[in-house]
Design a protein with these regions (language model features):
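Radical SAM/AdoMet-radical enzyme domain recognition
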Residues: 1-79
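Auxiliary Fe-S-binding modules of radical SAM enzymes
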Residues: 71, 81-84, 88-218
Length: 218
């Protein structure tokens, strides 16, 4: 991977509980995944990030992920679930609750001043640990004013905001043989119309996206 030019690896890992991992992924290989990410993290060429969506995990599951940062240069990032598609279940964990739990266990937390990537994650580090803990808290700590993302779905639809179903059908433009200049203008127009903020906390705000994240894509 390094010879091919790869210098960063992101791994989606919501739990290291073997049975829960199998239910989520359909595969019984969580130990293999753990060995692989530790192998990458122990090589200075790679920056390894674990993305964990906060669902209904037990604290022990989150703590097990956090413990990886004790001896390895790994960033464990906790992502608050957004009410999109099936993601409407009330989550039990938030950024503040995780930090409170760590402090209750006697851990000293400090903010990480170093810029890690270009995304919205906010990072902290436990005193004495090698790795970091990141939070992408779209619900409890909005970062819409810093959002620099649009998404292109598998069926060619450009979305300026995850919450809303509005956007631009680029696939239709391609199929109608629109010129490169016309497509460029449509993309620019879509970006300029990017909403100032999401309102996912208000289920009555209207225009809520009904597709699942797996359909929208990353």
């Amino acid at each position: 991977l390094h010879q091919a030019g790869t210098d960063g690896i992101n791994i989606s890992l919501d739990t290291m509980d073997p049975e829960k991992y199998r239910k989520i992924t359909g595969e019984n290989c969580v130990e293999k995944v753990k060995r692989a990410l530790i192998c990458c993290a122990d090589k200075e060429q790679f920056q390894v990030k674990i993305n964990c969506v906060l669902l209904d995990q037990e604290w022990e599951e989150l703590s097990e992920l956090i413990e990886l940062t004790r001896t390895h240069r790994i960033s464990v990032r906790f992502i608050e679930q957004m009410p999109i598609g099936h993601g409407t279940v009330e989550q039990s964990w938030t950024e503040e609750r995780i930090k409170e739990q760590l402090k209750a266990e006697g851990k000293t937390l400090k903010a990480v001043s170093e810029k890690l990537g270009n995304g919205p994650a906010y990072y902290i580090q436990i005193k004495g640990y090698k790795g970091t803990i990141g939070f992408i808290s779209a619900m409890s700590h909005k970062f819409c004013d810093k959002c620099n993302r649009v998404r292109l779905t598998a069926d060619g639809f450009l979305k300026p905001c995850l919450q809303y179903g509005k956007g631009t059908d680029l696939l239709k433009l391609l199929r109608t043989k629109a010129s490169d200049e016309e497509i460029r203008r449509e993309i620019e127009d879509c970006i300029y119309k990017k909403p100032h903020s999401h309102h996912m906390e208000d289920r009555k705000s209207g225009g809520i996206e009904t597709e699942n994240m797996a359909e929208i894509g990353g």
